[in-house]
């Protein structure tokens, strides 16, 4: 199974740049980019911080994609 996220969609709908989000969460823009491209899964702590940052339920940001 693969973890998929909706961070980019939510971030852009709120007109937040990767740079601004990275500064607010005290991580690098490259980390945000890698997470959005599903190349890196954030730690549980960071995933929860992102959900809190956007004020959305964790399940709205991340879900498991079933393999065929």
Regions found by a protein language model. Give the residues of each.
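A short, Lys/Arg-rich alpha-helix, primarily the initiator
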Residues: 1-13
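Alpha-helical residues within the helix-turn-helix
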Residues: 12, 23, 52
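Short amphipathic helical patch at the helix-1/turn junction of helix-turn-helix
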Residues: 12, 40-41
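Short alpha-helical DNA-recognition segment
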Residues: 16-31
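DNA major-groove recognition helix of helix-turn-helix/homeodomain DNA-binding modules
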Residues: 45-60
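Short, charged recognition helix plus adjacent turn
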Residues: 62-68
């Amino acid at each position: 199974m693969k973890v998929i996220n909706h961070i980019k969609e939510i971030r852009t709908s709120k007109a937040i740049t990767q740079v601004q989000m990275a500064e607010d969460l005290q991580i690098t823009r490259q980390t945000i980019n890698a997470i959005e491209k599903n190349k890196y899964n954030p730690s549980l702590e960071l995933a929860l911080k992102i959900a809190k940052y956007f004020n959305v339920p964790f399940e709205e940001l991340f879900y498991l994609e079933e393999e065929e």
